[in-house]
């Protein structure tokens, strides 16, 4: 009997100790994780993103984050070889221009499961805010913020020239006249030249009720080459009149610090609304946000994902990467640091929480997006595979026109032929 009791007691002890051991293991500290996070931007973005990372590490001591950042051009040059080697960072800042290129090549993780299991909380985010990161119903990029195309103007130079902008109903002809008046009366460029063309030519098409790419990405959508001719003839007139910079001058701009409006050489810069804050911080002159020409009738403006976060399939820490994205998007303390610089927050809860604490320039962005949002249309799908080649082709074509090496008429036909060949080959 004693022997049986001893055996039973031994078994009980084994279970008790094993239970304690399992409990200790379960309650022990989490496994240390190192995440690589990459983004592009200027120095102000680098500074506050670093602070957000430090805040995340403080709240999650088991996570160490290695930051990798560069300007726009260098960022994509670095990302390409990393992608080829299967060594992409765990979280990569993504642009819609490259989303299809990486997503359709099976290099990005579908984030839908992380939104469904609550790892990324979408309870205060409108579904339309996320659509810009979807391809074939897979969420390859999570939108960090939204912005709207805008005209950013130096109020001192407008006043000096004795001109104003009637944003509700000004036309392309009004814009051209304004540029001439600014050059003549204020002695500065009337515009930064609407550079780069892959952003502003598609907007021009939208004001005419047309689109740049077909829905399926297999070719150009607009059929009338006269639209191309009209757009670039205006650009050429402005350069000839010295009211817009030459391509050589535009090529010297490597960051916001170099922009003509910051240097006081231009009264107007065309850009996305989230860029306003950076410009406002870099110049002493008062800047204002205006709706671009002819946006009203065709509802030419759209809410565009300013940028997205993606997780590559090669990441070994996808769950932790998704947790960081959730923090970046939904944490109010983090967004007090971000302050909408990456676009107006997609979370209504976060947007409402930070708005009372925004300064004048930051408030201007939110109010501009709210104004523009009253008259917008559905955003275009993410740029198709091959769009990077098309973008380069359009830029090269634009340069040739502005250098007067080719006529807009001839360039329109050549561009159409080559662009369609690229898109047909890739889609």
Curated annotation (Swiss-Prot):
Pfam families xref list: SBP_bac_1 (PF01547)
Induction: Up-regulated by growth on type I rhamnogalacturonan.
Function (record text): May play a role in the degradation of type I rhamnogalacturonan derived from plant cell walls.
Family: Belongs to the bacterial solute-binding protein 1 family.
Name of this protein: Putative ABC transporter substrate-binding protein YesO
Organism: Bacillus subtilis (strain 168)
